[in-house]
Amino acid sequence: MKGIISQVMGPVVDVDFKDYLPKINEAIEVNFTVEGNTHKLILETAAHLGDNRVRTIAMDMSEGLTRGLDAIALGSPISVPVGEKVLGRIFNVIGDLIDEGEEEKFDKKWSIHRDPPAFEDQSTKSEIFETGIKVVDLLAPYAKGGKVGLFGGAGVGKTVIIMELIHNVAFKHSGYSVFAGVGERTREGNDLYNEMKESGVLDKVALCYGQMNEPPGARNRIALTGLTMAEYFRDEMGLDVLMFIDNIFRFSQSGSEMSALLGRIPSAVGYQPTLASEMGRLQERITSTKKGSITSVQAVYVPADDLTDPAPATVFAHLDATTVLNRAIAEKGIYPAVDPLDSTSRMLDPQILGEEHYKIARGVQAVLQKYKDLQDIIAILGMDELSEEDKLTVDRARKIEKYLSQPFFVAEVFTGSPGKYVSLEETIAGFKGILEGKYDQLPENAFYMVGNIDEAIAKAEKMRA
């Protein structure tokens, strides 16, 4: 059905139809020419203004659009390619390839606006999602089909953890991952693509990018594009998929820009009045069903370090676990720089993990907390002033700290150490031994950058030789 553009206000475009009214979220296509180049622009219907006029949000730059241009209603929402063919490729918000690779014909396409799975289809089992990363599996384990927040400043290693998770899911669980770059820097997206290519995980992951320079419509809907691809793997192929959203804050931020452009009255701190429901719609689709699961890791930017800001506060309500990266730990050379005391998980429960895992996790945290409390005394008076018991606690805490480091597969290029995947059983056994004092005689450097505890013992013997 043909309409005519009646008004262009940046990323917001009004279209008049004669005897047809596009539904909310229906896609509308506009073809126009700028300086001899033909452009295709997709608009998404956002509001009905009366008299068959609709207000739409542009999914790309609207420079060169003029009033009077023809706009064709496509009769359905934006649909994007799904299935195994999407692996190893980069898509934009409307599902077009943007990686300069060869053109591909996609026979399967799904609408990006979908209902979350029905209650009776959802799985209520609490299962642990083994990542092979010691610090995560022991202290803040991920739930299968759960949502994890990855908090950290610039350069602390968020991207490396994301790539390691993609690697471990691909090689240990032979699973697929989907990465949605929401309001990302183009450079970071490019780096991620090249690093994945080098580390050999690219053919197990689909990438969807809506970069920082794009209009708010593209930055907002790109999260749904990625999620739709992940849903296909879960619902049609019965797989356990890993879904990365970097950065979930930009999803709320672009929603707030769209809301203002559409003329809605803002709520707290200028955010859209529908912030909680938009976030809920996205997050409710990320879940476990009886067929498969989507486990999501979402990087969360906290504006001005204010955790009470409505955008991060809305995300918190949905998270099952938080992985907090700490610059102070990275400065000690301990990678992954996950803070063992700040990271949390609802899975840390004896009924889910079992008594032994829970006891050891809490024991490790208690030793590290005691060490933290003693640090002021050590700084002022030195180790000699501590009681024998405290000296032993400090010694074990330093070993635990070192043992929480781990060589990553995707970091082999710059560490020179082969990556290690440590199973949950090995992780628990290793930390249990340290807490019980089995390895008190080993030097603490033997625990640095190793996989399981046997490697630490072998390293200690090598150091003695």
Curated annotation (Swiss-Prot):
Keyword field contains Membrane:
yes
Which terms does the record give in the GO molecular function aspect? Answer: ATP binding; ATP hydrolysis activity; proton-transporting ATP synthase activity, rotational mechanism
Protein name as it appears in the record: ATP synthase subunit beta
Source organism superkingdom: Bacteria
The record's comment on protein family reads: Belongs to the ATPase alpha/beta chains family.
The record's subcellular location field reads:
Cell inner membrane
Q: What does this protein do?
A: Produces ATP from ADP in the presence of a proton gradient across the membrane. The catalytic sites are hosted primarily by the beta subunits.
The root-end lineage is:
Bacteria, Pseudomonadati, Campylobacterota, Epsilonproteobacteria, Campylobacterales
Q: Name one Pfam family in it.
A: ATP-synt_ab_N
Subunit arrangement?
Answer: F-type ATPases have 2 components, CF(1) - the catalytic core - and CF(0) - the membrane proton channel. CF(1) has five subunits: alpha(3), beta(3), gamma(1), delta(1), epsilon(1). CF(0) has three main subunits: a(1), b(2) and c(9-12). The alpha and beta chains form an alternating ring which encloses part of the gamma chain. CF(1) is attached to CF(0) by a central stalk formed by the gamma and epsilon chains, while a peripheral stalk is formed by the delta and b chains.
Q: What gene is behind this protein? A: atpD
Quickly give the catalysed reaction.
Answer: ATP + H2O + 4 H(+)(in) = ADP + phosphate + 5 H(+)(out)
Question: Enzyme group, top EC level?
Answer: translocase
Q: Which GO terms describe its cellular component?
A: plasma membrane; proton-transporting ATP synthase complex
InterPro entries in the record, alphabetically? AAA+_ATPase, ATP-synt_VA_C, ATP_synth_F1_bsu, ATPase_a/bsu_AS, ATPase_alpha/beta_chains, ATPase_F1/V1/A1_a/bsu_N, ATPase_F1/V1/A1_a/bsu_N_sf, ATPase_F1/V1/A1_a/bsu_nucl-bd
| Coiled-coil features, chain-numbered ranges | none
